[in-house]
Amino acid sequence: MGRLTADFAKAFSRDLKKNAKRRNWNLTELEKVIDLVVENTPETLEELRRRHNMHTLSGNWRGRYECHVANAGDWLVIWSSNVSVAFFERTGRHDELFR
């Protein structure tokens, strides 16, 4: 385990641009989640599991992780990672991401 580099899919950036202002998302909370993912220590992963309900996905999203951002209700982040990169793929609500 070690610090990862963050990389963002075009879809993630598009989701963020489309929804952040309209839904009044607190981007500081998103930055905190991204920092926890990128830090990639046992402590930060435990915090993601405990406070943000991080879990692995199945089906079309198999091999990826998902967690909730802060206490924002239905605001999710989906990412995958390898030994050096955390690749943030999508962000949004359940009904947008899991159609």
Q: Language-model segments: which ranges?
A:
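Basic, Lys/Arg-enriched alpha-helical interface segments
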Residues: M1-D74, S81-F87, H94-R99
